[in-house]
Each structure stands twice: as C-alpha cells, then as structure tokens.
Amino acid sequence: MTKRTKKAGIVGKYGTRYGASLRKQIKKMEVSQHSKFFCEFCGKFAVKRKAVGIWGCKDCGKVKAGGAYTLNTPSAVTVRSTIRRLREQTEG
C-alpha cells in the first residue's frame, strides 16, 4: 500500500509537493474514482472504474461510459433531468 496519512488520505503519497489547494482538488478526484457507485441495472453498489471514462459493474457485468473520475458527469445529469422534464411535459 502506498504512503498516506490520516489527514491527507490518498494524496499523502505526494508529501509536501504541489501545494495544498492542488492536493485538495486531486484528493476529491482520486477518492471518487476509487469508490464504488450504484448500478442502475442490478441495483447494487458494485460499479468501479476500469479505465478513463469506462465503468463496469462487478455484479452484473454491464459496462457503461461515463466521466473520467465519476460515473456521471454534471452535464450528463443536467441533460438527463432536462430530457425527463420535457418528456413529462409532452405526455401530460
């Protein structure tokens, strides 16, 4: 396992290099890219990052394209909610 501390966490491997604000940004990205996400297909928290923008569910085996560090990018969430809202307006 790599070097880490209680406060710095996953970015403890960088030591005092690169500045505190940059390390905080990197910490947010690295924590999200290594965490498990909810699978829309099987309903379990089993989706992990395979490569940049490729996410796969360990349980059901489905593979989904997403963001580089998170499963759903903020713009994709906005587009999805807009499409859902427009679909509801046309139906009702």
UniProtKB/Swiss-Prot annotation:
Matching InterPro entries: Ribosomal_eL37/eL43, Ribosomal_eL43, Ribosomal_zn-bd
Where are the C4-type-classified zinc fingers? 39-60
GO BP term, pick one? translation
Q: Which domain of life is it from?
A: Eukaryota
Instruction: Using the record for this protein, list the coiled-coil segments as residue ranges, or answer none.
Output: none
Which residue ranges run through the membrane? none
Which terms does the record give in the GO molecular function aspect? structural constituent of ribosome; zinc ion binding
Q: Which family does it belong to?
A: Belongs to the eukaryotic ribosomal protein eL43 family.
Q: Which PANTHER family match?
A: 60S RIBOSOMAL PROTEIN L37A-2, LARGE RIBOSOMAL SUBUNIT PROTEIN EL43Y
Q: What is the official name of this protein in its record?
A: Large ribosomal subunit protein eL43
Source species: Pseudotsuga menziesii
* Gene name for this UniProt entry: RPL37A
